[in-house]
């Protein structure tokens, strides 16, 4: 176990320990760049003290590479990663959305991701990427079910 200062934000602790996907943005809990999972729920690591996370499960994008890999390609395909600075927060929140609601509609996606700020792409690329990913995922799952039923 590591000694930490009582006022150290989780964001700073994670970055000091090599979790560089967690970005520093506004430091006021408004931009979503510092999103991590705390006990499987998305939280803003700039607004939580590292000491409060002691004993909890903390997951950063580094721990979700496999789950994020396919999805990120759809974001990139839509040109939604111009500078890429906001991507880790978007990806973390999109994964949380997919886990919570595997079939969100466009309004649910917009609402869920409303806490993520992007300086350069206007969100439309991210939205198109998410919708295309969900369509691809549903088609893939449907094909998998059809193949499984044909094998019986």
Over which residues does each language-model region extend?
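Signature of N-terminal electron-transfer/Fe-S-associated modules in redox systems
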Residues: 1-152
């Amino acid at each position: 176990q590591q000694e930490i200062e009582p006022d150290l934000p989780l964001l700073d602790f994670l970055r000091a320990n090599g979790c560089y996907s967690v970005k520093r943005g506004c430091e006021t809990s408004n931009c979503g760049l510092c999103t991590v999972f705390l006990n499987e729920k998305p939280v803003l690591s700039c607004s939580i003290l590292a000491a409060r996370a002691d004993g909890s499960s903390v997951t950063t994008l580094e721990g979700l590479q496999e789950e994020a890999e396919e999805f990120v390609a759809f974001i990139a395909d839509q040109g939604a990663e111009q500078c890429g600075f906001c991507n880790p927060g978007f990806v973390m929140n999109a994964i949380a959305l997919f886990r919570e609601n595997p079939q969100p509609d466009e309004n649910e996606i917009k609402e869920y991701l409303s806490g993520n700020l992007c300086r350069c792409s206007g969100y439309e690329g991210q939205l198109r990427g998410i919708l295309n990913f969900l369509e691809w995922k549903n088609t893939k799952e449907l094909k998998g079910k059809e193949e499984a039923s044909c094998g019986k």
